[in-house]
Amino acid sequence: MDFPGFKNSTVTVDGVDIAYTVSGEGPPVLMLHGFPQNRAMWARVAPQLAEHHTVVCADLRGYGDSDKPKCLPDRSNYSFRTFAHDQLCVMRHLGFERFHLVGHDRGGRTGHRMALDHPEAVLSLTVMDIVPTYAMFMNTNRLVAASYWHWYFLQQPEPFPEHMIGQDPDFFYETCLFGWGATKVSDFDQQMLNAYRESWRNPAMIHGSCSDYRAAATIDLEHDSADIQRKVECPTLVFYGSKGQMGQLFDIPAEWAKRCNNTTNASLPGGHFFVDQFPAETSEILLKFLARNG
């Protein structure tokens, strides 16, 4: 999906093409999507930010127009550490050594890892509608498991989830898209939905998304356990949907206060995909936070 006024391109990182779109002038902002979306999720937000910033919206490896390599046995090529390295290389390719990072869902987890691994690069971090990966796994109970069942389904050994999803990818991914609290089909722009469907009908994307969750339950959890005493130092916006399942199951601000030294909290009365429900309000909150931490 093309954004008006944005230029599409790719950067090759260790043999993997990472797709992105860029526009605007001013302090750089990297925007990263989550599951099961791609960079199209920012279509109604990025143009507003580009009036004041250089905005880069990229696809994570395994998603959208980025390459979708076969997962390695140790899952390292789908770890958040690798995702973060990919995106750092995109920004350095564009000439940005330091930048703001806005991440929803898996993009937020990628941002958390980047802020730990490359603190010199991240001017500010925005994490959208998540708690840290470690907290998700360590605090799973019957309510969390019932709401976030896909975390445990997608991590099952190949080819079980790939085969099941592949029978009807629209049904599976749309169950996720419309099932995580206060979101309905009319909240999503039709062009954006078309971009998501085109992506997730690709068997390689199905494998990529499963690999992402397999990595989270193994190598990412190992990395997070090793870094449990470390905190993010940059200004961090904790932004979530107050009517979503994450906001109802967790004290999201409290969880991030354990992992970050400088947090600001914001919420909108939506679900997990509050960006789609409230694009104008999302843009306004982001612009104010970025201006304060420019």
UniProtKB/Swiss-Prot annotation:
Per the record, its GO cellular-component terms are: membrane
The entry lists its GO molecular-function terms as:
haloacetate dehalogenase activity
Q: What class of enzyme is it?
A: hydrolase
Task: State which Enzyme Commission number(s) the record gives.
Answer: 3.8.1.3
Q: Which reaction does it catalyse?
A: a haloacetate + H2O = a halide anion + glycolate + H(+)
TM regions (residue ranges):
none
Q: Which domain of life is it from?
A: Bacteria
Listed name of the protein: Haloacetate dehalogenase H-1
